[in-house]
């Protein structure tokens, strides 16, 4: 009987963990599985040691190999990996007679080594680039929404919380006036900021406690509560509520409008695969993937409902983790913002981003709409438009869109539009006396440049490959690997998964 433990070499001259595949194991594996295992040879597993706080029976290098191999074979749960450790010849050989780790050990290892697992992923990507599997010229980015482990009905809406917080603040101000009437406070509520009101009511609560009253006295019909005890209970309840509201608003943050009670990192989003076909909101994460030559070369996760703010973090991560720099960047219209265009051009990328008006701008209705500033004559030197009736529309103001970072100009007709024969076509729903609109000239110029790039021979080739490269990664994750819903709470655990 062959000693299979001799076929697994776990260290070389430099102490580097690696895996060798021999003939007796190759007969048990499919060719594509062999290729993936050979790809793991020579990777650096030393970073896994730093997260272990005690001596473990299974070496961290071996554990990393076991987990990656199990995921390759389609086993993603810790209990499924534990069963595989007891039955699979390859993993038994890796363990070299050591008892198989149980599911808690496997789960704890994954939880502690999120950063190291991500680093292992980018080691594989760099190795793919070194052996010529990647084009290393154009990177394709796209995102998908994957449901969180949290329940559907655990939502917390920021607007609702803020509304209740305002009501609670008004009640607390009223309670301060009541405490003044009872002689428990001398602070006038009018003109005070809420922080001072909150601090004073905390003092009022302490003063009532020092009076020695029965604060737990039963209330109800036939029982008359002391006004100070009643005030104490109301103040205690509202102070607790305002703290809960402040914590919820802080957890939601400025860029979100919702969160889940059981998974505060998750945001409620409309999922495409809704069974009821009505866009039901579910707690989810926005998973972003960068692809090259049908390989996933980068991955990020966020709580954003849109893709606007995901381009820059992805490219910064690729610059940091990969040993080369891409020259072209391709994405769909979800990434069409001035901030993304400016970042890509500043850092030497050629942006092949489809404008949001790419399809609608080709329609006859759009091109014949005389009310759109895109169809008006524009004098760039003096910065004014000329409408279909030959009247001048000059710039009267400017601003910046906070969401997209795009600057715009406010333009208004120099003459009244009353009596103009084209007013009904030009100002269809507006009841203003003269034509007025906001023109995003910076974004307009960037979209024109992007449209020229996409219509070039190189742009057509990249545009044809975009859906194949970007959407193929999601087909692999969602279709083949069945990743439809995360099994862990928190954005970090979800990303590791």
Predicted regions and their residues:
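Hydrophobic alpha-helical membrane-insertion signals
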Residues: 1-31
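Anion-binding and metal-coordination hotspots
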Residues: 5-6, 10, 56, 67, ...
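Generic low-complexity, intrinsically disordered sequence content enriched
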Residues: 14, 29, 40-43, 272-273, ...
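Basic, short loop/linker segments at the boundary and entry of helix-turn-helix/winged-helix-like folds
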Residues: 23-68, 439
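Short alpha-helix boundary/capping elements
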Residues: 41-44, 71-74, 89
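Short amphipathic alpha-helical interface patches used for protein-protein assembly/oligomerization
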Residues: 91-95
């Amino acid at each position: 009987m062959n000693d299979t433990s001799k076929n697994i070499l776990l260290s070389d001259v430099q102490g580097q963990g690696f895996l060798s595949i021999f003939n007796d194991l190759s007969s048990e594996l499919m060719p594509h599985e062999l290729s993936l295992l050979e790809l793991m040879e020579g990777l650096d597993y030393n970073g896994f040691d730093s997260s272990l706080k005690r001596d473990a029976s299974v070496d961290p290098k071996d554990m990393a190999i076991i987990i990656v191999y199990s995921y390759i074979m389609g086993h993603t749960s810790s209990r499924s990996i534990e069963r595989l450790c007891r039955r699979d010849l390859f993993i038994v050989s890796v363990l070299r007679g050591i008892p198989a780790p149980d599911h808690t050990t496997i789960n704890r290892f994954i939880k502690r080594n999120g950063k190291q697992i991500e680093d292992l992923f980018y080691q594989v990507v760099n190795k793919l680039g070194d052996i010529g599997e990647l084009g290393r010229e154009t990177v394709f980015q796209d995102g998908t929404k994957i449901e969180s482990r949290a329940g559907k009905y655990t939502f917390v809406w920021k607007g609702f919380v803020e509304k209740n917080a305002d009501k609670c603040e008004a009640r607390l101000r009223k309670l301060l006036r009541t405490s003044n009437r009872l002689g428990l406070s001398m602070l006038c509520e009018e003109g005070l900021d809420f922080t001072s009101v909150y601090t004073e009511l905390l003092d009022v609560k302490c003063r009532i406690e020092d009076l020695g009253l029965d604060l737990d006295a039963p209330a109800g019909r036939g029982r008359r509560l002391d006004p100070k005890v009643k005030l104490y209970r109301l103040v205690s309840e509202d102070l607790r509520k305002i703290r809960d509201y402040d914590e919820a608003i802080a957890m939601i943050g400025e860029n979100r409008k919702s969160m889940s009670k059981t998974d505060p990192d998750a945001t409620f989003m409309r999922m495409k695969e809704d069974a009821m076909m009505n866009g039901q909101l579910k707690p989810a994460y926005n998973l972003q993937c960068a692809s090259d030559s049908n390989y996933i070369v980068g991955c990020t996760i966020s709580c954003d409902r849109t893709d606007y703010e995901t381009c820059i973090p992805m490219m910064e991560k690729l610059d940091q983790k990969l040993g080369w720099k891409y020259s072209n960047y391709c994405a769909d219209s979800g990434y069409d913002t001035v901030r993304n265009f400016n970042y890509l051009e500043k850092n030497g990328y050629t942006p092949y981003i489809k404008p949001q008006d790419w399809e609608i701008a080709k329609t006859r209705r759009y091109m014949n709409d005389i009310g759109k500033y895109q169809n008006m004559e524009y004098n760039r030197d003096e910065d004014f438009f000329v409408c279909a009736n030959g009247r001048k529309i000059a710039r009267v103001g400017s601003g910046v869109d906070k969401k997209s970072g795009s600057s715009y100009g406010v333009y208004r007709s120099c003459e009244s539009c009353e009596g103009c024969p084209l007013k009904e076509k030009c100002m269809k729903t507006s009841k203003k006396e003269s034509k007025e609109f906001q023109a995003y000239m910076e974004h307009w110029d960037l979209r024109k440049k992007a449209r020229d790039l996409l219509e070039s021979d190189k742009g057509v080739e990249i545009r044809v490959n975009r859906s194949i490269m970007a959407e193929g990664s999601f087909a692999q994750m969602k279709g083949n690997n069945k990743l439809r819903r995360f099994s862990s709470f928190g954005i970090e655990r979800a990303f590791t998964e």
